[in-house]
Amino acid sequence: MRRTGYAMMLLVAGTLLAGCADRGGPDQGASAPPTPLESGTTSPAPADPAGLIGSWSVAEADEGEGAILRLASDGARLFDRCGVWLGSWRADPNGLFVVGLFGLSGPDGTEGCALESTPGWLSRASGFRSNGDGRILVDDQGDQTARLLPGATPTAGPNLAPSEVEPPVVTDEVRRSFAPAVELPATLLPATRAGLVDRWVPIGGRAPKAYVELGADGGWSGSDGCNGTSGRWVAGPAGALLATTGPSTLVGCASVPVGSWLGDAWRAGLDGDVLVLLDARGGEIGRLRRA
């Protein structure tokens, strides 16, 4: 994707917000680091994903010093030396956290600023915990990738409206959107991160070319049968699954929206060899099998 402007980035605005659950109300007091259960998961711990909403100064991050991360109900934005990154994010009360960046508006030719070089400290982040008024981002082993300090003030550039840099508003509706997801039904075995890493295709055969591939590096790619898309994902205990989605083309064809399925999912369970994706209320979104 070329770094042009937000008009192109917003081509599929509907998918940008598919997982942008943002919530507010910082926790008080520092909590212990999450305990790794397996690669890519952390133990349940009291967490307030709504408390992530805000503009944060990035500290103690490899090549991230001085950046500002803004998390709001309309998505994620990272302000750094490269310009302004556009993306989406998700988090849950288990302390899971994931950001996917898919657009960059900034000066062409800045060294190390290709879209493919999303900052490593952010791409490695798969969880969060409170630290006083700040937040700590951690990787899948519970090791810190960055410290977030409150009170940052991003500057609006030529491609941003003033409202896009103002302190995000946390409504009751937004808070409710971060309520704990319904547990998996007893008939499903919780999917683990290791078990999810694979290429999956929707059951039914309506769109033979549709698939989603979950990578071990936390990235995913897929197609509804004729339109490609991608994002990032993280898995946790009890079948918790969060994924971000990025832009896609809009070619019409017989399709299955597997990317949207993934972006809407809060839990993943196995019915034998079949992967079942569920929404926050426990409703079934879709079923897939290994390719």
Would you name each region that the model predicts?
Residues 2-9, 18-291:
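Lipid interaction determinants
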